[in-house]
Amino acid sequence: MSKGHSLQDPYLNVLRKERIPVSIYLVNGIKLQGQVESFDQFVVLLKNTVSQMVYKHAISTVVPSRPVRVPMLNPESTGNDDMESGA
């Protein structure tokens, strides 16, 4: 399951750490706006005037208000997410 999170988690973490305002579009077309307060494997906590727990399976698109640079964890690794595991 970690392969699906190799880009998602660092991207959401940058949005959270830098408090970048985002628009989150849900699969039903609803647009939510706020800042990523926290996230885990299944949900994103979005904060505006209130905090909303948004299930990731309901999210279609995350649009930041400004460009986001996601640090590359291991640019040489093209298909192996088991970094330094020796496996």
Swiss-Prot record:
Keyword set, alphabetical order: RNA-binding, Stress response
SUPFAM superfamilies: Sm-like ribonucleoproteins
Gene3D superfamilies: 2.30.30.100
Any single biological process term in GO: regulation of RNA stability
CDD domains xrefs: Hfq (cd01716)
InterPro entries according to UniProt: Hfq (IPR005001), LSM_dom_sf (IPR010920), Sm (IPR047575)
GO cellular component: cytosol
KW RNA-binding (keyword) present: yes
UniProt domain Sm: residue ranges: 9-68
Record-level Gene Ontology MF annotations: RNA binding
Pfam family, one: Hfq
PROSITE patterns: SM
Cysteines paired by S-S bonds: none
The keyword RNA-binding appears for this protein: yes
Record function comment: RNA chaperone that binds small regulatory RNA (sRNAs) and mRNAs to facilitate mRNA translational regulation in response to envelope stress, environmental stress and changes in metabolite concentrations. Also binds with high specificity to tRNAs.
Known partners and oligomeric status: Homohexamer.
UniProt similarity note: Belongs to the Hfq family.
Annotated PANTHER family: RNA-BINDING PROTEIN HFQ
Protein name, as recorded: RNA-binding protein Hfq
Organism the protein comes from: Teredinibacter turnerae (strain ATCC 39867 / T7901)
